Amino acid sequence: RVLFRSVILEEGDIINVDCTTILNGYYADASRMFVIGRTTAQKQRLVDVAWECLKVGEKVCSEPYVFVGDLGNAIQKHAHANGFSVVRDLCGHGVGCHFHEEPEVEHYGHRGTGMLLVPGMTFTIEPMINTGTWRVFIDDEDPYGWEVISEDELPSAQWEHTYLMTENGVEILTH
């Protein structure tokens, strides 16, 4: 197992960098994947499918008044169709004056369920896509309490944007 505080990155590693910003009292959240040099075809495919899952979620939100379950269902179908799983223990979230607000934006689920995403809402889409099981744990030795590891310790990938739902669909706030 690799601990973030002591790791030396090596050729083929994939890493996620997740950043939160606060501007004028409002939060935004984003993460990006990086490939160190050349990696295996499987890891590259994982990174690519995780990006595609983010874009699938965006497409579902191209019009307002969609359910969180619509978004989650589409992401889950895309990940599974490509042989990957979607983490269920972590989800996207509303953002605003607080870092984590309603709604919880699950990246799996059933169409027509969950909160309705309406104009004026700000939220993240951040599917964590795993090579193996969807189950994860938080590393007990992580001093920040936020190093997430897949239960089977196989590679994971995650991209994230913060969005504003408008009358015309989502606007990406974290380009």
What are these regions (language model features)?
Residues 1-175:
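Active-site neighborhoods and metal-handling regions in enzymes and metal-associated proteins
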